[in-house]
Design a protein with these regions (language model features):
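N-terminal targeting signals for export/organelle localization
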Residues: 2-119
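Hydrophobic beta-strand positions
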Residues: 124-125, 235
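Short active-site neighborhood of thiol/selenol oxidoreductases, capturing the structured segment around
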Residues: 133-164, 177
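Structural microenvironment flanking redox-active thiols in thiol-disulfide oxidoreductases
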Residues: 159-213
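Structural micro-motif
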Residues: 198-202, 219-234
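Thiol-/selenol-based redox modules, centered on thioredoxin-like
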Residues: 227-259
């Protein structure tokens, strides 16, 4: 065999090896491409905002609950009840006439909020079914308690709604109603209802925080501070005036004051 033939036969083996290496490398790149395509498709089809929001709320709830020695379990309804058991001081069990006649009780005073003694800003928002609810209709010739909460991913927020739902019959005896508002979408609230059960008053979606900002509970981002959402509880009288209000980092749980 000539030297040229020998050289050619030796070079044929590395060429095949390179071909296989190229095929394996290209196959690997193909797998990676498909993997990232699947991830991209998932995030386009199902945006992560709701999950991210819930994660942030759960962390915020965890920090607040730790102040009371409570450890979150991930079960929002269970954690909400645990928060109520520790934080809520007034548990209403007597009849309404007895509660209202209690002269020893000192109700919490209203904060000096901007809306105090002003006409309540009207709103039209969707409930968990997608139906539109309007404050001027809900509160026509009747008192309304308007509650702003951070969403159903927040156990201490849900605690306030649980407490109000438990005492709802007292408010109904006074011909008053309750409406709760958060940035949760109607679909998200509906999913939570299926998991944990419904409340017996309207729970509305203020997805863009427009209503929350008008009521002074949502503070948009500025150059100095990030955006922030407070809890807010307001009493609207029969004439549509805001006669009492509370805004803060934790929910207002003294239902006796609201009566």
């Amino acid at each position: 065999m000539s030297d040229d033939q020998t050289s050619l036969s030796k070079s044929a083996v590395p060429k095949k090896s390179r071909d296989w290496s190229t095929k394996i490398f290209l196959s690997f790149l193909g797998v990676i491409t498909v993997f990232y395509a699947v991830i991209l498709t998932y995030h386009v089809a199902k945006p992560p905002e709701t999950v991210a929001d819930d994660s942030g709320l759960l962390e915020q709830c965890r920090q607040i609950c730790l102040q009371y020695g409570l450890v979150t379990t991930g079960n929002i309804r269970k954690d909400a009840q645990a928060y109520l058991d520790v934080v809520q001081k007034q548990h209403l069990t007597d009849g309404l006439s007895v509660i209202l006649a209690d002269s020893s009780f000192k109700p919490s005073e209203s904060q000096s909020i901007a809306l105090l003694n002003q006409t309540a800003p009207d709103f039209s928002l969707a409930d968990h079914t997608g139906a539109t609810q309007q404050l001027s209709v809900l509160g026509k010739n009747r008192p309304v308690i308007v509650v702003f909460y951070l969403g159903y991913g927040c156990s201490h927020c849900v605690a306030q709604l649980l407490a109000l739902d438990k005492d709802l019959h007292y408010f109904r005896e006074l011909d008053a109603d309750i409406v709760a508002i958060s940035s949760d979408t109607p679909e998200h609230t509906s999913e939570r209802y299926k998991e944990y059960g419904e409340f017996h008053f309207p729970v509305l979606a203020d997805v863009d925080y427009a209503v929350s900002q008008k009521w002074g509970v949502y503070l948009p981002e500025t150059e100095e501070k990030p955006e922030f959402m407070n809890h807010g509880t307001f009493i609207i009288d029969r004439s549509g005036q805001v006669v009492w209000g509370s805004i803060g980092k934790e929910p207002f749980l003294d239902n006796k004051t609201l009566l």
